[in-house]
Amino acid sequence: MAQVRARLSGVTKVFESGNGRVHALGPLDLDLGAGEFVTIVGPSGCGKTTLLETLAGLTAPTDGTVSFEGKPVGDEVPAGVGVVFQEDASFPWLNVWDNIAFGLRRAGVAAAEIRARVTYAIAFMGLQAFARAYPAQLSGGMRQRVCIARTLVLQPRLILLDEPFGALDQQTRLLMGDELLRLWRETHATVLLITHAIDEAVMLADRVGVMSARPGRFIELIETGWPASRSSAIVAEEAFGKLTAHVWSRLRGESLRALGRTEAEPAGSVS
């Protein structure tokens, strides 16, 4: 692996609820190399989002340590880390240009630098025709392009994405995946993406992390072997089908366990 950019070591997360303690995550370990693209799949409720929020500094682990570029992650998103969620996070009262510039203005970046970065991000994400449009005038895919562009202008070295294309149709997801791969290649950022779509996870990743049912742990980290130049065209390759089938074979049992079922128990059976 290349130089480690982010690391989770022995991380667990326990939540207190009205019904007692909920062991949501871990213990688990994960190293993210500089310039690596890692995707994570797992059953619903296994702690995927909790893992991302822990790495981003949005929630503290109950046990274990989290670091970014060798420094402990505290209780806020570290400089150099960008986060994109599934939910539309654009500001409806700002047009596309001002949405993308928002974080730079808050950070006190000089006006000329803001213009240069926003102009580049808008061109990179294919938003030139929509720079003065408002979020309500855009499709879901275009709004996600705006959110990714808003992260891009901050020049993050680690990009964390939680189901960024979850609300999009399959064709748009594949095309957005191609855009994300292009962004990854050009910026050399480390990317961690959470998804429920196995084909998306396999297409995008250098490594696919498969998580267990709650409490979430890694049951396998799978090397894909794809070249950095990959695109959605690989979904038609035989190797892609085999790798996708392998990921599902590891995930299926955990998904059944999360539903309280076993391999031998058919759906709809009643005990």
Go through each PLM region and give its residues.
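Conserved ABC transporter NBD signature motif
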Residues: 64-76
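Short coil-to-helix segment of the ABC ATPase nucleotide-binding domain corresponding to the Q-loop/switch region
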Residues: 94-102
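Conserved signature/switch motifs of ABC ATPase nucleotide-binding domains
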Residues: 133-136, 154
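Hydrophobic anchor residue at the start of the ABC signature
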Residues: 148
